[in-house]
Amino acid sequence: MHMKSLTFAIAIAGTLLAIVSTPLGIAADNALRIPAFTAYLEPDNGGARISSKSGVTSWKDASTKVLWFGELKKPGELNVAVELRLPQDANSKLRLTVADQSHDAVVKGAGTNTVTARFGNFTVAKPGYQKFTLESLNASGQSSGDIDALVLDGVTTNNTHFNYKSRRNAASVHLGYPVPKGTNVAAFYCEMTGVEDPVHTYYMACGWHRGYFGMQVNSPTERRIIFSVWDSGGEGVDRKKVEDDNRVKLMGKGENVYTGDFGNEGTGGHSHLKFQWKTGEKQRFVVTAQPTNQTFTIYSGYWFHPEKKEWMLISSWRAPKEGGWLRGLYSFSENFGGNNGHIARKALYGNQWIRTDAGQWLELTTARFTHDVTGKSDRLDRFMGVENGQFFLSHGGFNEGFTKSGESFPRPATGQLPDIKLPLP
């Protein structure tokens, strides 16, 4: 009996020794492995890189942190580790913070083999989204390792929600505006206010079946008012492949407005005005349709310049194989760069009106919420609602809750007809 117990103890000890001393690249069967290519960098200023092929690489700036976000639907104990690669015998000291608890780990490299930095147990006191913050405690310039994955034990896929795909953008979210049946829409007016303003944000006010009109945050120092109209035909990527009789043609543009081509999301004519629109300040947009015959329609985008206090033409385009009015009216909010999909975006959309071909103004007070495929299951932090009498769209930030796709909301009518005096295109 004593011999059997001794043999059993030696076997167990040998197993534990092997686990500790052997580089590990595979998580335990019941553990979750969250790929490093789903993480974010903070700040994202070149201190490391993230790619779908290699995860987090070139991490030599000790001020750069690696962040993962996920929803834990039940409280409890969580054992956390990080898989990484380091040069042979190189050391890296790392710190992981979860739920206001920080643990350190030192790991020795094994060349091309993966090693595991084990941070031990963390107590998650309440369900909800959690941030996993990985920091380097190494000297700046020293490699902290190439990160492959965050590994969680103590949870299962049934009570967690993470995005496992390399697309790190927040879900795109939309407002669809129903219009009375049989209405010929000659103009669509919408007021919009950016509440949050992270880089790579497109707040779009006036969209229709042939284009969209709104404002972007393109960099920390550049913002734009943007108006685009799609070509006819089915080309989705390269405008050089679009036949001339399918191309939209520029008819006019405003002062200092750039015009050109766009592709990769359909093709067409693009225009933008560089303007430092202000967060929290209402912007006013109107798009018009002028059918010239049964074949062509001229679409024009006008924006109210808040400094000049007058309406300005952004651009005007003649669309072939059209001849109709504005259809499929909508607004959206888009995170068009994936490196900062963890930051919340929010805008207000209000006082929507349409003008019929007979000159009658009708107020639109109902909107229907939808989202893109990312919002279906990968990113659930997407919302619509009514705030201060206006619709709002919000996405990103890993905030609690979500709005169901297809849900409609009413807003209170304002009765405030648009005061519009448009310049000719």
Task: Name each model-derived stretch.
Residues 26-276, 284-291, 295-425:
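Extracytoplasmic
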Residues 1-5:
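N-terminal secretory signal peptides that target proteins for export/translocation
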Residues 9-20:
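Bacterial N-terminal signal peptides
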